[in-house]
């Protein structure tokens, strides 16, 4: 005959086993919101929520000649496409061209922003500063 103590221990053991089995399937979601630095130009871009989508705009530039770009929205509304990933239009503020953009979180302080035209893609890893 099983006592209450044994039944409780068995229940706790079963719950712990289920948790350990499910652990690898739990995705670690990183937050893209905040200010990020583009390493190649020193440009700072704020990623923010815009109606449940991911938007981004230029908030600071290193090169004074690019000061007119401050406030330019470069990502007007990307949608989540997978865990830690968003896809949407991406504006190149320098030439005005629109690309397919993919934001992939690589950790809490690193994201990769990739722009694609047809099958040609180029990406860069940005660092979170705020």
Describe each region flagged by the PLM:
Residues 16-17, 27:
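Cleavable N-terminal signal peptides
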Residues 102-123:
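Short, exposed beta-strand-loop hairpins at the edges of beta-sheets
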Residues 23-29:
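Sec/Tat signal peptide C-region and signal peptidase I cleavage site
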Residues 32-100:
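Central antiparallel beta-sheet cores of small beta-barrel/beta-sandwich binding domains
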Residues 129-130:
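Short, solvent-exposed mixed-charge patches
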Residues 2-16:
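Bacterial N-terminal signal peptides that target proteins for export
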């Amino acid at each position: 005959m099983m006592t209450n103590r044994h039944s409780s221990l068995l229940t706790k053991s079963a719950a712990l086993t289920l948790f350990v089995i499910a652990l690898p399937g739990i995705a670690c979601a990183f937050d893209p919101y905040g200010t990020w630095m583009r390493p190649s130009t020193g440009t700072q871009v704020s990623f923010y929520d815009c109606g449940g989508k991911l938007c981004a705009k230029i908030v600071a530039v290193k090169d004074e000649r690019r000061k007119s770009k401050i406030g330019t929205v470069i990502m007007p509304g990307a949608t989540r496409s997978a865990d830690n990933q968003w896809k949407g239009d991406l504006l190149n503020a320098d030439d005005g061209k629109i690309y397919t953009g993919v934001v992939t979180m690589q950790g809490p302080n690193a994201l990769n922003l990739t722009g694609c035209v047809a099958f040609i893609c180029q990406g860069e890893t940005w660092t979170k500063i705020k």
